[in-house]
């Protein structure tokens, strides 16, 4: 599932991007003016703080730094808005070409709460979401967006926000019926004795108990653990052939911590893929590359969703919709935290 980048750039999207050149230039000019005049205004304020007759110690440098950050942020505002306009235009055009929809703003739903409850996401104190892609994928309801989760760490002057998760949350209707709740989690997530002992026999998720499901494949047990409230159905969902596929999937997304929750007829996937879909640029010559990169990033996410999904016979949907049995490497893997997409699917 990949957009026709060449067709988009030679058609309506390319024409629209050409029309945005004036907007880009005006945004740059406005930003430069803001930086110039606010910088002039900030200089005497910084001098006053620096040469106060009483000693503020280190705090005076913090005030000057805060003043400089304020000048930069205010000046960058027009550029930020221009890049967002370009990004929304490009991503919306890619989505239309794929027959789905795109929205920059996201209102997380039940899938987000389920991902939190069952441990697909780490604990956090601040979160934000953006870049929602939704519609149908291989005939199944599909919803994807990015999440950025942070925790406050340190103390005193070393107190700071630290990213604990930045990646994609994918919610897709599963291709075969099931009634249980089954969790595919990273190895070692749930242990006895407050995390100090060996693997637990069961885990509690907000009052919902899931029991450990034995898997005989040593390579699988070295990476994943399966937890479920229905041992029989869990083994039907994660059967021997599917286990082999999950091992290959982990190899393809090496280091990106794929995990999934099967519940209520759908599968919810979390993957630490970094910051994606940033197609907005102030330089028109970058547009074609940005469109191609964003298109490939979404295609890789779609391949991941179909690679985890199954049809009614328990076969992987991705294998049903292509002739090659092996994953195909992406043409231009995206960059960013977590190294997502190095080998593609």
Language model features with spans:
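Charged, low-complexity intrinsically disordered regions
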Residues: 32-37, 92, 96-98, 104-113, ...
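Cytosolic juxtamembrane N-terminal segments of multi-pass membrane proteins
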Residues: 1-32
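Hydrophobic alpha-helical segments of integral membrane proteins
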Residues: 42-46, 50-51, 72
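Hydrophobic alpha-helical transmembrane segments
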Residues: 50-67
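Transmembrane alpha-helical segments and their cytosolic interface motifs
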Residues: 29-46
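Transmembrane alpha-helices and immediately adjacent membrane-cytoplasm interface residues
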Residues: 64-88
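Short alpha-helix boundary/capping motifs
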Residues: 48, 67, 122-124
